Swiss-Prot record:
Annotated signal sequence range: 1-17
Region (Disordered): 61-91
Organism this protein belongs to: Cerrena unicolor
Residues that hold substrate according to the record: 290, 332, 340, 384
Membrane-crossing segments per the record: none
Listed name of the protein: 4-O-methyl-glucuronoyl methylesterase
PROSITE patterns reported in the protein's UniProt record: CBM1_1, CBM1_2
GO cellular component: extracellular region
Catalytic activity from the UniProt record: a 4-O-methyl-alpha-D-glucuronosyl ester derivative + H2O = 4-O-methyl-alpha-D-glucuronate derivative + an alcohol + H(+)
Annotated EC: 3.1.1.117
Annotated keywords: Disulfide bond, Glycoprotein, Hydrolase, Lignin degradation, Secreted, Serine esterase, Signal
Length: 474
């Protein structure tokens, strides 16, 4: 039998250390044991404590807390206004959705799927219809790309303690009293006397990157403890999988949503925490921005969703990102993402090469937030974020808020001039407007939908992708 020598082992170790990570690949982070070098012309940039990535350019971007230079002026580019149409066909009875489709056999559509038509071809007429369509979209996304989101488990208990302006929410969740997990997120409170209904709260994935205004509490959610995201080898690792098993279909992002829901359960059970559970927001940046969008889509108790620079796999659409790739923009797409990490279910691997057969896309994921509020922020300086895809995808999603008659509950702002996940001060007024209105219950103007139109080698043309006419849902 062959026995490797110490010299051979040393050579293997040396070769592993010298290997370069691929373009856009992971090159560092907590728990990372793979290559740390990048190809020529690419630099290993730390995006957060858990993840560094090979990005184009010779020098890494400054840390998130570094003050960013003012971005170039953004030009307003409003989405197409809704045009009223009279849908044909019967609608589900309000409150009774009937059978919910989780798959659509023989689907084939290279353009963006119509949010206003059920899988069976029936057109939406009413706001109650949207509730049913939203349930259908949820089932489709879980089946095709996210994995199954389990319901509230039989055991959920919580206790709360506070020292100064910092609180600790100790949560136990389990399938039985003998099969539980525990986690304890911390809450940073504003100074002063809380409002009568408690403080509004933002759940911040890994602490978040946005400036939180006065009067809003912040809960730091260590989502990577709930489901690890170090690399493609992280699948089935984390607290969620200790409870449901390492082979559960839920992706890491779906497991994070489950954790957010348990946090809100715990807050509802602990009035001493003095949190207004009717005024909860969620945020995160980059990979955690993808997760924040997923949480806002699936957890209906979230009042305001704020994904930041989530890009492909977040507020970008798979079909549009592929279009960018096909036309010379080096962006992340579905094929690259499923090989990079565990943010999506293994079932999605079956569809990344045949996206037209998928009866959903991320304009529908974002639309699941409606009629609740959402604003997403993107950065055109990083082409791999797929800026045209994000703008086009959110333009398509915006039609749902338009159809519901609440267009100013959905916003989008896209600028450059700052590092990835560094906050540009020029966007603070838009951010504060949404927080003031939807978390602080103050009057604010939230008609925000802007881009600087820096899309690399492509341009957005709504007529090429949006095939539906936006109805006025009654």
């Amino acid at each position: 039998m062959f026995k490797p020598s110490f010299v051979a082992l040393a050579l293997v170790s040396y070769a592993t250390a010298q290997a370069s990570a691929p373009q856009w690949g992971q090159c560092g982070g907590i728990g990372w044991t793979g290559p740390t070098a990048c190809p020529s012309g690419w630099a290993c940039q730390q995006l957060n404590a858990y993840y560094s990535q090979c990005l184009q350019g010779a020098a890494p971007a400054p840390a998130r807390t570094t003050a960013a230079p003012p971005p170039p002026p953004a030009t307003t580019a409003a989405p197409p206004p809704p045009t009223t149409s009279a849908p044909t066909g019967s609608s589900p009875v309000a409150g009774a959705c009937g059978a919910i489709a989780s798959t659509v056999p023989n689907y084939n559509n290279a353009k963006l799927p119509d949010p206003f038509t059920f899988a069976n071809g029936t057109a939406l007429r009413t706001k109650a219809d949207w509730s049913c369509r939203r349930a259908e979209i949820s089932a489709l996304i879980q089946n095709y790309e996210a994995g199954t989101l389990p319901p509230k488990p039989p055991v959920v208990t919580a206790s709360f303690s506070k020292s100064g302006n910092t609180g600790t929410l100790a949560i136990t969740a389990g399938l039985s009293n003998s099969q539980t997990i525990k986690f304890s997120p911390t809450i940073s409170y504003p100074s002063g006397t809380p409002p009568a209904n408690g403080w509004p709260l933002i759940i911040a994935y890994e602490g978040g990157s946005i400036p939180i205004p006065a009067g809003v509490a912040t809960l730091t959610y260590s989502n990577s403890d709930m489901a690890q995201q170090n690399s493609a080898s992280s699948r089935g690792q984390g607290l969620f999988y200790q409870l449901y098993g390492s082979t559960h279909s839920a992706s890491a992002m779906t497991a994070w949503v489950w954790g957010v829901s348990r946090i809100i359960d715990a807050l509802e059970m602990t009035p001493t925490a003095q949190i207004n559970t009717q005024r909860i927001g969620v945020t995160g940046c980059s990979r955690d921005g993808k997760g924040a969008l997923m949480a806002g889509a699936f957890e209906e108790r979230i009042a305001l969703t704020i994904p930041q620079e989530s890009g492909s796999g977040g507020d970008a659409c798979w079909r549009l990102s592929k279009y960018e790739i096909d036309n010379g923009n080096q962006v992340q797409d579905a094929v690259e993402i499923v090989g990079e990490n565990v943010w999506f279910s293994t079932n999605f691997n079956n569809y990344v090469q045949k996206l037209p057969t998928v009866p959903e896309d991320h304009h529908l994921l974002a639309a699941m937030v409606a009629p609740r509020a959402m604003i997403s922020f993107e950065n055109t300086d990083y082409l791999w974020l797929s800026p045209m895809s994000s703008f086009g995808c959110m333009t398509a999603a915006h039609t749902v808020w338009q159809g519901l008659g609440i267009a100013d509950s959905h916003g989008f702002a896209q600028v450059g001039g700052h590092a990835h996940c560094a906050w540009p001060s020029s966007l603070t007024p838009q951010l504060n407007a949404f927080i003031n209105r939807f978390l602080l219950d103050q009057s604010a103007t939230t008609n925000v939908f802007t881009t600087n139109n820096q899309f690399g080698k492509v341009q957005w043309n709504a007529a090429n992708w949006i095939t539906w006419t936006t109805p006025t849902l009654t």
